[in-house]
Structures are given as C-alpha cells and as structure tokens.
C-alpha cells in the first residue's frame, strides 16, 4: 500500500500495479478468473459512469446543480405543518460547530466530558421551564418518535392497552405512533376534529378503563389552540394519562402544558435553532412528572458533587437497551440528536424568556393579520373559528382547485401553504375531509410586506379566468 509507484495516490486502496502483483501471487491472470465459478447473470455489472472529474470541475458541476434549487430563503414561504422557517442567530451554528461538541459519538466515559454533560443538563432544565414539567430527558430523535415513545411510556405506566389520538394531531406523529402500536399489539383509536379542535363529548365516549393515554397537540396541526385543562380533567377522571405535543416557540406565549394538566409533554426542536435542511435532522424533546421518571426513555443527565465536594455532572439514568437488559429497558433511543438538542439550548438561551415571548407574539400577530387580509378576498374564509397561534387553515372558493392555486402561487414566488385535501405521501392524506382547504404558517421571517403581497397575489390568482377553467378540468377528471 506504500509502494513508491502510488505516492501521489494516497487514498486509493490498491493501484493497478499492486492488483497485478497480488493476482500473480495468487496464481491467476485476471480478476475474472477469481469469480469464474459464479454465474455471469448474477455478477455485478460494470457501472456506466463517466470519467472522473478534477476537484475544480466537480465543484463547477455541483454549483450548477445547486443553482437549480429554489430555497425558501429566495421565496415567500408560508409552509408549516411541523417544520418552520425561523431565523437562526449566527451564535447557534458557531457554538455547536466547536470541536468539543461536534463529535461523532457520545464518550464511553461520559463523565470525562463535563462540558457536554452540562449542556445536556441545561437542555433538560430549559425544557422543564417552558413545558412546566418536573423532569426532561436528554432528547429524542424527533417530534413524531417522541410522541410514539410517550404513548409506549403511558402503556407501561398504566398497564392498559389502548391509545386515543385526537384528530388535531399531526399526521406524521399519528403514523409513527400507529407503527409502534401495531407492533406492540396496542389498540389505537382516532378522534375526529370536524371543527378543528377536540370535541369533549366525543372524547368522553372514547374513554374507558382500557385507555392508557390521550394524545393532544397544542396548538394542533390546524393551528387551533385546544382547551387542555378541560380535556385533561376528563382524561384523568377515567384514570388515563394526558400526552401533549407542543411547538416550543408557542410556549413563549401560551400557558405551559404542565400547568394545564399534562402528564407527558413532547415536541420537536426544529423550530428552535435548527434549519429546515430538507426536513432534517432535528431532535425531539420529552418531559414528564417526577413520579414517572423511571419509565422515561433515553438518558438523563444529573448534577451532583464529586469526592472532592465539587459540582459534577453525570448520567444518572440510562434505561436504554444498550446499557441494561433488553427486558428491563424503556427504549432503544440512541444519542445521535444531542447536537440538535444543543442548538435548541443555545437558541433558547440567547432569546431568554422575554425574547421567546416576543418571538411568539410577532408570529401570532402576523398570522392573525394575514388571516384577516385573506378573508377579505371574495370566496375565501377561515376553515375553523377556533383561536389559533401562528398557523391557520383557509377554505378557497369551490370554483377553484387548491392544488392549482398553490401551483400558481409557487410560479409567482410564493409557497402558499399545504393542501390539506391532497395526498401528502403514499401512506395517507393530511386531512381528506377538508376539501379545498390550505394550511398556512406565519413566522417572524414573513415581513408585513410579504403578507400584503400574498393577499394581493392570491386575489389576482383567484380572479383569473384561466385558473377557473383549469379548475373545472381538474374537478371533471
């Protein structure tokens, strides 16, 4: 491998001369002789690839490909549904890119890395502060898996075998939880959300002694703010647990779920210091009441004193199957989201409580401003009348098709939202019962000028005769 003939090819595993020498020592003339006993129709075929490029040529090709992208930063984006475009201060990537944090894996002697453990401890503290809960873990993979793990945690705590999910829960959370439940032979019931929020009488009819937990999103997928306290009272009256999914930014303004009766709170860290990045990576968070700490999945960092009386951080509970017997483990949740959790911590620390409140207020005020502007357009109305945070649904006139309208907006530089009646992916629809409805999200990144432009362009698009003719064709097909 260190032949004088390949000194300028240090990354090649073997040069042509070295391969020839090895074949000669083996006693065959060519590589094909080594695999001659393998039928030709099952052998790997030679890939039809072009000649290799120099670094300069490759850089040019990749730049040309990247130029074809249409990132949200070059458009007016009103997409939401779980991933939100928010401003990330430069200090966030600066800190998480430090070599002390940006490592390949957790140290196998974690107490050596006191800085990393302190960061995890501070992350847990921040999560407890915004959720109003007693204890939080070191992070989860993302929001959907945190939701599923919370459901499994509730099953272990109650010994019951049924989960109720309200209709306002994000479809991705619901599908991941359903996957977990089906594998574990746990029943899963879906509550409708015909008016955008959970119906109390429908919930009461679903509750019985077999229900382990009820999962509610706050604000929910449609942006509506659920009445958590009333729902929690009903859930607890039947001996079940209340699992709440929350966008952390909304908690800068809304009452903490823990103060409204939540037993377990989960969510996604994407909106706090993490970029959209084509949908990932992100991190999930999970917090619960102190009584449930032994069933909390993942890792927990704690603070104690060492044998010299100095403050020290340590991993206090690690009920993962990597650390204890599988039969006693709470989950197999890994550690690879720690860097994204750190980004959330840095983001929240930079904002502080007042900054988070101001950020949430701006998002809410601008969302309400846009909703009012859009509803002034003939034929456009809010789909639900429920109070909302920074996300809301509108219903377009029956004479047009939502997918066509959104495509027209995109052609004009506006990502107008999510078509709630469209097939989100091969596994199911976002909300097929909501015909011609669009889900719109607003953050601090959407200026008032952008909001005015959205309303202006949507009005133009809806008044277009060409659009209406196209919509008729779409509806006829």
Q: Residue spans of the language-model regions?
A:
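Charged, compositionally biased N-terminal leader segments and the immediate start
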Residues: 1-23
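Conserved PLP-enzyme active-site core in the AAT-like
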Residues: 145-314, 379, 394, 403-409, ...
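Short loop-beta-helix segment that forms the pyridoxal 5′-phosphate
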Residues: 108-112, 116, 128-148
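Conserved C-terminal alpha-helix-loop-beta "cap" of PLP-dependent enzymes
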Residues: 354-454
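Gly-rich Lys/Arg/Thr-decorated short loops/hinges at beta-loop-alpha junctions or inter-strand turns
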Residues: 1-2, 98-110, 126-133, 158-159, ...
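PLP-dependent enzyme catalytic core of the Aspartate aminotransferase-like
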Residues: 18-24, 125, 426-477
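N-terminal entrance/gating region of PLP-dependent enzymes' catalytic architecture
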Residues: 14, 36-122
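Active-site C-terminal subdomain of aminotransferase-like
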Residues: 272-378, 382-385
